[in-house]
Every structure is written in C-alpha cells, then in structure tokens.
Amino acid sequence: MDKAEHDLTDAQWSALKDAWAGCAYCGARQTDLQKDCMLPISRGGRYTLENVVPACPSCNASKCNFEVTSWLRRKKLDEQRFLVRQVEIRRTVAASIAAIQ
C-alpha cells in the first residue's frame, strides 16, 4: 500500500474545530476531538481539509472504517444536513485560510 499524503495543516484543523464547535456527527462539545476521515485511510482517504471533520472519541470509534454516508444511515443521523454543513464549513475554512496567506 502506498503511503497516503496528508496535507491538513494545524491552522486548518484548528479552524475546522472552531467552525464545527463540537463533534461533526453528534454535536458533543468536547475538548478532546479527534480527526476523523470521512473516507477512511483504509479506503483511500487522506487527512485533508476536504476529508477531515472533528469527531468525539465515541463517534470516531463507532464510525471506524465505514464511509461516512453509510455510517450516518446506519446510525439514523441526518445525512443531508451533515453533508451540506460539511461543504459550507469546508468552503468557509478554505476561504479564511486563503485570506491569511
């Protein structure tokens, strides 16, 4: 297996956590949020702005190697709401990081 490229910067990760203001999946407001790849590394995902969301340890462990939409359906979470919010936040973070640079 080729080594995956990971290009999520510390500034992007910090901005993602601030924008989500908690777990992207369940909304838990914790300080120990973890980087979760919506498309898992095991399935070709990478640690990038487009693929990472903050997750509480419980959601991160539950999602494990599932692709995000199948996991959201299994957990009976609002898939459309999550995906729309993820795109909005990703665009906002990308624009704010670009403005700084």
PLM features: what roles do these ranges have?
Residues 1-22, 82-98:
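Short, charged surface segments at domain edges that flank catalytic/cofactor-binding sites
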